[in-house]
A protein has these predicted regions:
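Short secondary-structure capping/turn segments at boundaries of alpha-helices and beta-strands
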Residues: 17-21, 55-56
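A broadly used, surface-exposed interaction patch
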Residues: 54-57, 68, 80-82, 92
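Surface-exposed extracellular loop regions of Gram-negative outer-membrane beta-barrel proteins
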Residues: 73-80, 84
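Signature for the C-terminal beta-barrel architecture of outer-membrane proteins
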Residues: 2-14, 24, 29-53, 61-64, ...
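Short active-site-adjacent helix-start/loop capping segments
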Residues: 38-42, 68, 76-78
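One-face residue pattern on beta-strands with alternating periodicity enriched for small/polar residues
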Residues: 18-20, 68, 100
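Surface loops and adjacent helix of pleckstrin homology
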Residues: 70-72, 114
Length: 237
């Protein structure tokens, strides 16, 4: 990790090892990523059996059906509605653990869906070795990919996210997740900031925030030109 008392780069030492292991059998595909790190660039040390499994999923694929169980890393359309990925260099991982399904109903219609839950961990400072804040979340996503005519694709999507924010999760400075979001210039942050006194004086330790998103995208190729447009609306309750 970063040296705490010196800026000498020779003191910056890491021992991070990643092992991608996969296997296939007929229509099944198994993927696992193991990590042995002592210490890693960012994140916690992983040297014991209960911590070295970094991610995994089992996938089944045929001509019409694609089913995946485990850690879900996916992007739909341009990612405005749903986008999960892993960036090892910054210890970022917003995947969910659950199930993902895609079904090709016919030549012009594909239906896809996923459901999962996980704990999202993040840092209040980019140079923190460990994540210091977190919240639990559950996502339910449903979409359709429609091909009305050749070279035109229409996507209609719905996403429900449920966030569980606990005041007991605080960083070293004593700021909890509610306080952190109140300082962000977002719709959710502004709403929390306007009601921060109510959050501070009530006897509730955990807050449930629901987000309902509707998305519409259109892409295609006409008259020698590629075009793409996407719209998403979000409502917090």
């Amino acid at each position: 990790p970063f040296p705490l008392t010196s800026t000498d780069t020779t003191e910056y030492k890491i021992n991070e090892n990643l092992f991608d292991i996969s296997a296939t059998y007929k229509n099944f595909y198994l993927y696992t990523q193991l990590e042995y790190s002592d210490p890693p660039i960012f994140g916690e040390t992983r040297t014991t059996i209960d911590k070295i499994l970094n991610s995994y999923y089992l996938e089944y694929l045929n001509e019409k059906l694609n089913l995946k169980l485990g850690d879900i890393y996916s992007v739909y359309t341009r990612g405005l509605m749903f986008n999960t990925y892993q960036d090892q260099s910054t210890d970022f991982n917003n995947s969910i653990s659950g199930v993902e399904l895609s079904y090709l109903a016919n030549d012009w219609l594909r239906i896809y869906s996923l459901y999962g839950t996980d704990t999202y961990e993040f840092r209040t400072r980019p140079d923190n070795q460990l994540s210091d804040l977190s919240f639990n979340h559950t996502s339910a996503f449903l979409g359709t990919e429609i091909h009305p005519i050749s070279d035109i694709i229409l996507n209609i999507q719905y996403l429900n996210q449920s966030l569980n924010i606990s005041e007991s999760v605080t960083n070293e400075g004593g700021v909890n997740t509610i306080g952190y979001y109140a300082n962000l210039f977002t719709i959710l942050g502004n709403d929390i900031a306007e009601n921060i006194s109510d959050f501070s004086t009530d006897n509730i330790n955990s807050y449930q925030i629901n987000a309902d998103m509707l998305g519409l995208s259109l892409q295609g190729y006409l008259f020698g030109l590629d075009f793409y447009g996407e719209y998403a609306s979000n409502k917090y309750t």
